[in-house]
Amino acid sequence: MAGRLLANLIVMGSGIIGRAVFQAYRQALANASKSGVAQEAMQNGVRQAGKAITEQEARQILGVTEKTSWEEILQKYDKLFENNAKAGSFYLQSKVHRAKECLEVVYRSQGNGTPS
């Protein structure tokens, strides 16, 4: 009997606390949107997410120099991408892919032929 009563108190108490936390969160969001804090936080998040890797980082990831031909870069890219696909590392695959994209933009802007 005491266990049942205790279980009911715990369930009811957690429901009340859950609703209070939810209402406090909604109120905090409303206050933040009035003061512009939410807008600023969102803009900072977008700004940070939009940062691309530098050419130097891309070259380090792929292990190439400035004098490396586009064909060699593609060979290194394919090898690294496949090796990380076997290991199941999506994070490393995405880093390798972003590095190739960065160098592709650099090669196109230099007019060294259109990378394929």
Swiss-Prot record:
Membrane-protein topology: Peripheral membrane protein
Domain of life per record: Eukaryota
Record carries keyword Cell wall biogenesis/degradation: no
Compartments reported by the entry: Mitochondrion inner membrane; Cytoplasm
Record: transit peptide: 1-27
Protein task: Regulates ATP-dependent protein translocation into the mitochondrial matrix. Involved in the uptake of thaxtomin, a phytotoxin produced by Streptomyces bacteria, that causes dramatic cell swelling, reduced seedling growth, and inhibition of cellulose synthesis. Modulates polar auxin transport. Involved in importing a negative regulator of plant immunity into mitochondria, thus protecting plants from over-accumulation of reactive oxygen species (ROS) and preventing autoimmunity. Confers sensitivity to virulent pathogens such as the oomycete H.arabidopsidis Noco2 and the bacteria P.syringae pv.
Annotated protein name in UniProt: Mitochondrial import inner membrane translocase subunit PAM16 like 2
